[in-house]
């Protein structure tokens, strides 16, 4: 299984970049993992939020094949404990999924078309985080899931 971590635009703050790189490197010890950056839209001054979501959605959907699994990191998604997240990752690995795309939406979220295409929606918290901050939170939780699955001493109950 190859995990694609899809981001809209580059990570702005150096402390977030460093954290994401740290956990990305660790994740690669367990599974094939790559970061896919969808470039930020240019000339959005004359676009409303819905038009921005639509254009970002079109860029995302153009990267997917019908067989790809699309998981949206979304405040309306299912919430897991870290142990439940690990169990879900194991379930997906057991299903022999080839490509799974975990997507952090842009600042305004996802278009209706992206929601319709999604196989699953995952929420990391009831709280709202910036689309920049969620990048670090997600890769840490993904790393934690793999340490749980491998009985390594990172996670403590």
Give residue ranges: language-model regions:
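Short histidine/acidic/glycine/proline-rich micro-motifs that form metal-
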Residues: 9-14, 76-77, 128
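Structured adenosyl-cofactor binding patch, chiefly the S-adenosyl-L-methionine
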Residues: 112-156
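Short glycine-/acidic-enriched loop or helix-start segments at secondary-structure transitions
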Residues: 15, 81-83, 111-114, 133
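Loop/turn-to-beta-strand initiation segments
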Residues: 2, 98-102
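Rossmann-fold NAD(P)-binding glycine/threonine-rich loop
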Residues: 105
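Hydrophobic/aromatic beta-strand patches that form the interior of the parallel beta-sheet core
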Residues: 6, 36, 71, 120-122
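S-adenosyl-L-methionine/SAH cofactor-binding core of RNA-modifying enzymes
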Residues: 32-33, 39-98
């Amino acid at each position: 299984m190859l995990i694609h971590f899809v981001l809209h635009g580059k990570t702005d703050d150096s402390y977030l970049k460093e954290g994401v790189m740290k956990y990305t490197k660790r994740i690669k010890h367990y599974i094939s993992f790559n970061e896919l950056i969808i470039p930020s839209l240019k000339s959005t001054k004359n676009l409303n939020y819905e038009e921005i979501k639509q254009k970002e959605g079109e860029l995302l959907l153009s990267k997917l094949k019908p067989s790809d699994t699309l998981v949206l990191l979304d405040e309306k998604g299912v919430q897991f404990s870290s142990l439940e997240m690990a169990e879900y990752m194991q379930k997906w690995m057991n299903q022999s999924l080839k490509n799974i795309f975990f997507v952090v939406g842009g600042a305004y979220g996802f278009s209706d078309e992206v929601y319709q295409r999604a196989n699953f929606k995952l929420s990391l918290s009831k709280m709202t985080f910036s689309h920049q901050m969620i990048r670090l939170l997600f890769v840490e939780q993904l790393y934690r899931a793999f340490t749980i699955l491998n009985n390594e001493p990172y996670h403590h109950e």
